[in-house]
Amino acid sequence: MREIVHIQAGQCGNQIGSKFWEVISDEHGIDPTGQYVGDSDLQLERINVYYNEAGSNKYVPRAVLVDLEPGTMDSVRSGPFGQLFRPDNYVFGQSGAGNNWAKGHYTEGAELVDNVLDVVRKEAESTDCLQGFQLTHSLGGGTGSGMGTLLISKIREEYPDRIMNTFSVVPSPKVSDTVVEPYNATLSVHQLVENTDETFCIDNEALYDICFRTLKLTTPTYGDLNHLVSATMSGVTTCLRFPGQLNADLRKLAVNMVPFPRLHFFMPGFAPLTSRSNQQYRAITVPELTQQCFDAKNMMAACDPRHGRYLTAAAIFRGRMSMKEVDEQMLNIQNKNSSYFVDWIPNNVKTAVCDIPPRGLKMSATFIGNSTAIQELFKRISEQFTAMFRRKAFLHWYTGEGMDEMEFTEAESNMNDLVSEYQQYQEAAADEDAAEAFDGE
């Protein structure tokens, strides 16, 4: 029933991915060996969305783990949930992509991609009614970005009518791991625009800010950041995994969230975000949740929704709460902030409610916004890209793997087109008076 095949590529993708499996295994009562140790039928009712039942009472994730070097894989395998995954589903090379998109997409990655597709095919064949794929990766490195996008386009060829969903970690403005991030990210976005149905943009810097300001962690680790990401991922998929009063699946989400096919880059948010020490001191209410999840401080992408307008948004509430109250609050927030929503899409906020809250919380909300403000993120990458590309800095690493400069130019202009499309719809709302006058003639 509506299965999802999960793929994690590259170091970042594997770290986020394995955290995600820890979180949802916990929610479904699956222990690190794959045995069910839960206490509620609800945990098993839709367990087959993400897990395969291998034998009596043993559940195996429908996950494919991909990397071009063995390092991260080894640490996943020796990590707490390493024995959960099917050993054949670890697919790795030995050479590494060295943060080079061309290696991931054209040379090293292309050699490994058929092995990966075999495993993906095997997973897809064991499903009843495949809903789609989700990929976790980063856009700044070599494997996640280069090989990740290669996998997407190959899977797209084979399963054109299935939803393709990515959780993409976008290079952040202040925190940079490698110099060539702008190149890798631009080349990746060029692919994502064409080949995915929904992309959740996650940004390390925004995550750092949340950890630092809201969660009061003085020195956040990648573990802390990944925990936030996995909370969001668990929230986005919660409707698929648990029964609820108002359910959504990946396709419903796409239909409601994507007004124009290219504009499918979402900003996730999560509430309640309270520091660990503060958690037990406050009961959270539906109005607070709604307020918090539209708050710019809770966004996981480093752009400010107040600088743009929401084309569409979705909120997924978890926990026992009154539907009536949820609807009232959602309406309330739209009325109060009506200037931040485009007026040419009426009722552009979708709500879903699921009865089962995440561990340790009475209720929570996950927010997904399709805001024109996301262009800030692409603009930033594009500026850095242009600065380097104008001088042809570092290009030899890419041309040496057989890439052409033309491809860079195309990717650059595709990204700039994307920015101006967002801008166009942001302004489409701004001059409706002129449009009304025009209609009135």
Swiss-Prot record:
Its cofactor is Mg(2+). SMART domains: Tubulin, Tubulin_C. Its main location: cytoplasm. One of its GO terms (biological process) is detection of mechanical stimulus involved in sensory perception of touch. InterPro entries: Beta-tubulin_BS, Beta_tubulin, Tub_FtsZ_C, Tubulin, Tubulin/FtsZ-like_C, Tubulin/FtsZ_2-layer-sand-dom, Tubulin/FtsZ_GTPase_sf, Tubulin_C. The keyword Cytoplasm applies. Keywords: Cytoplasm, Cytoskeleton, GTP-binding, Magnesium, Metal-binding, Microtubule, Nucleotide-binding. It comes from the Eukaryota. Mg(2+) binds at E69. GO terms for molecular function: GTP binding; GTPase activity; metal ion binding; structural constituent of cytoskeleton. PROSITE patterns: TUBULIN, TUBULIN_B_AUTOREG. The keyword Transmembrane helix does not apply. GTP binds at Q11, E69, S138, G142, T143, G144, N204, N226. Tubulin is the major constituent of microtubules, a cylinder consisting of laterally associated linear protofilaments composed of alpha- and beta-tubulin heterodimers. Microtubules grow by the addition of GTP-tubulin dimers to the microtubule end, where a stabilizing cap forms. Below the cap, tubulin dimers are in GDP-bound state, owing to GTPase activity of alpha-tubulin. Plays a role in mechanosensory transduction (touch sensitivity). Belongs to the tubulin family. This is Tubulin beta-1 chain.
